[in-house]
Swiss-Prot record:
GO terms for molecular function: glucose 6-phosphate:phosphate antiporter activity. Disulfide bonds: none annotated. The lineage of its organism: Bacteria, Pseudomonadati, Chlamydiota, Chlamydiia, Chlamydiales. Transport protein for sugar phosphate uptake. The chain crosses the membrane at residues 34-54, 70-90, 113-133, 161-181, 185-205, 257-277, 302-322, 331-351, 363-383, 394-414, 421-441. This is Probable hexose phosphate transport protein.
């Protein structure tokens, strides 16, 4: 047995606990423990992912870099992260998330520290690329855990609550880096998140576990007595339990449940354009406000924090509405929220002649509200429209496209802003939001049942 297998192989299923009351008690305990652990873990992944973003204005001042050079560094992370998200999705579906997520977080912390020790573009690109690769180890194990510990009828709500970790991390890191820059300079803004994440990685090793069956608990569908079938599966509890025992081969995951799935292709291309908008607003809006409205770094970063906070509320509402109003279908909410995103971007650009920070902050809050709804539900829909044992790969596949979109928000949009000004920048964002809306329309009625009919 090689070292990789020894560390990452999923633990074997053990004999199921026979006492129903003990099963209920254990399920309640482990669901909460695993949830808060992966929630906090992903908050800290954001610390090491976005530290550079909020150090950018200081890097321009201290080292004399221009927007295009900084865009290259940013795009490097998004490219390596996007590729890793797909590759790591395949790996994580056959790995123990306890170690997979934790080791990824530890290495991102180390990468941030080495970035802070560097001063040249080649070294920045190297360490930020390594960081991007191991950032891809954060999301797929969470998708695996969410599909194994939470059932179909509740998953939209739990997934949306977990997804607020993006926003909490995104809202905290501008404050942390802003304070760190004021007291220690931009290097301290890289060191501090890095050290915190190394510590958190070891905490995840202690807190996380794999599937319910590895702890002697029944599959979630059997426990909740739901016919929570995935495409190509029967819906009886016995078959579901038997299926839960069987790990899929890499070939089955890729070719049977992911690459031949038409809904994943619509979701993936939509994800590309949603992420262009998301990362453009996240990475460039502070610089836009500083350059065009002469806001202080703290005030501009506060506006970006409002973008993240708006996203938190948007995700929670989108997940709840898709569970209740849409009866588990994610397509309708994706369409409605994308339309709201298009209108809110127009609103922010319409305030360009008003130098009032709370107006800009309000529009960024609204953009975040409408953007993070579909951003969250793309991954959820991908996991649900695939196989339970392919959830990490399916969501990683959409994530692969997403972070190519994010890479487009780096150098290409930086070049647009440099050559055509902020007007060209906003035109590009509006075009991306419109294309995403069009791509969501065919998925309005997408469901496991419609995929089953298509595939048989």
């Amino acid at each position: 047995m090689n070292l990789w297998t020894k560390i990452f192989q999923p633990p074997c299923h053990i004999k199921e606990i026979s006492d129903p009351e003990l099963v209920k008690k254990q399920y309640k305990y482990w669901r909460m423990r695993i949830f808060y652990s992966m929630f906090l873990g992903y908050v800290f992944f954001y610390f090491t992912r976005k530290s550079f973003t909020f150090a950018m204005p200081t890097l321009i001042a201290d080292l004399g870099f221009d927007k295009a050079q900084l865009g290259i560094i940013g795009s490097t992370l998004y490219i390596t992260y996007g590729i890793s998200k797909f590759v790591s999705g395949v790996m994580s579906d056959q790995s123990n998330p306890r170690y997979f997520m934790a080791i990824g977080l530890i290495i991102t912390g180390i990468s941030n520290i080495f970035f802070g020790l560097s001063s040249t573009i080649p070294l920045f690109v190297l360490f930020w690329g390594i960081n991007g690769w191991f950032q891809g180890w954060g999301w797929p194990p969470c998708a695996r855990l969410l599909t194994h510990w939470y059932s179909k009828s509740e998953r939209g709500t739990w997934w949306s609550v977990w997804s607020t970790s993006h926003n909490i991390g995104g809202a905290l890191i501008p404050v942390l880096t802003g304070v760190a820059i004021d007291y220690t300079g931009w290097r301290g803004a890289m060191f501090i998140p890095g050290i915190i994440c190394i510590i958190m990685g070891f905490i995840l090793i202690d807190r996380l576990r794999d599937t319910p069956q590895s702890l002697g608990l029944p599959a979630i569908e059997k426990f909740r007595k739901e016919e929570d079938a995935h495409p190509h599966e029967e819906t009886t509890a016995d078959i579901l339990e038997e299926e839960a025992e069987r790990e899929l081969s890499t070939k089955e995951i890729l070719f049977t449940y992911v690459l031949s799935n038409k809904w994943l292709w619509f979701l993936s291309f939509a994800s590309f354009f949603i992420y262009v908008v998301r990362m453009a607003v996240n990475d460039w809006s502070a610089l836009y406000l500083i350059e065009t409205k002469d806001y202080s770094t703290v005030k501009a970063n506060l506006c970006v924090s409002l973008f993240e906070i708006g996203g938190l509320f948007g995700m929670l509402l989108a997940g709840w509405l898709s569970d209740t109003i849409s009866k588990g279908k994610r397509g309708p909410m994706n369409v409605v929220f994308s339309l709201g995103l298009l209108v809110s971007i127009l609103g922010l650009w319409g305030t360009r002649d008003y130098f009032v920070w709370w107006i800009d902050g309000t529009f960024l809050f609204i953009i975040g509200f409408f953007l993070f709804g579909p951003q969250m539900m793309i991954g959820l829909a991908a996991a649900e429209l695939s196989h339970k044992k392919a959830a990490g790969t399916a969501s990683g596949f959409t994530g692969w496209f997403a972070y190519f979109g994010a890479a487009f928000a780096g150098y290409p949009l930086g070049k647009v802003a440099q050559d055509w000004g902020w007007h060209g920048f906003f035109v590009a964002l509006l075009a991306c939001a419109l294309i995403a809306l069009i791509l969501f329309l065919p998925t309005w009625n997408a469901s496991e049942q419609s995929l089953r009919k298509h595939s048989h």
